[in-house]
A protein has these predicted regions:
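Small-residue-enriched hydrophobic alpha-helices in membranes
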Residues: 1-29, 33-170
Length: 170
């Protein structure tokens, strides 16, 4: 521990709500850029309000949460975060984070390689297999595939095509 490390620490403990905010920031920044769609998705999860200047910012109730999460993400690695967060989360909270993380990743139309790696780290840290997560993933992929509206030749727009969800028995 260096002399000044005491000033770097996050004095508040990890909470599930904080883990949600931090996980979304880690996912958003995985590819080195914060896309507008990802910011919009973050605001939809954390809540937003008009700040009076014509732009929407994080609502007052969650501004402190987001500010704290931004500071945390700047100072900590995703591996350190996952080691700290995983033990305090319930199964439902882990899945909520994973679904929101993949939604953020796909909000701009595709999951970059770095975002795919990030999701893999989250799945592993949370003890959720790809097989178990697959149905959730498929729903979010469908939700974000807006090309079904703009491409009449999209394979899912063919006569007789029916969306099906495969649910594993894990």
């Amino acid at each position: 521990m260096g002399l000044f490390d005491m000033f770097k620490g996050d004095t508040e403990e990890m909470t599930p709500h904080f883990a949600l905010a931090a996980s979304l920031l880690f996912m958003m920044g995985a590819d080195g850029e914060y896309d507008n769609e990802e910011v919009g998705q973050l605001l939809s999860v954390l809540g937003g309000e008009d700040n009076g200047s014509g732009s929407i910012g994080v609502g007052a109730n969650n501004k402190a949460l987001l500010d704290r999460a931004v500071k945390y993400v700047r100072k900590n690695t995703v591996d350190a975060f996952l080691a700290e967060a995983a033990p305090i989360l319930t199964d439902a909270q882990k899945l909520c984070i994973l679904v929101n993380a993949i939604d953020s990743s796909l909000s701009d139309g595709q999951a970059e390689k770095e975002e795919q790696v990030m999701l893999g780290k989250m799945l592993t840290a949370f003890g959720i297999s790809e097989e178990r997560f697959k149905p959730f993933f498929e729903v979010i992929v469908l939700k974000n595939d807006r090309s079904v509206f703009t491409n009449k030749n999209h394979p899912k727009n063919k006569d007789g095509y029916e969306v099906k969800l495969e649910v594993s028995k894990v």
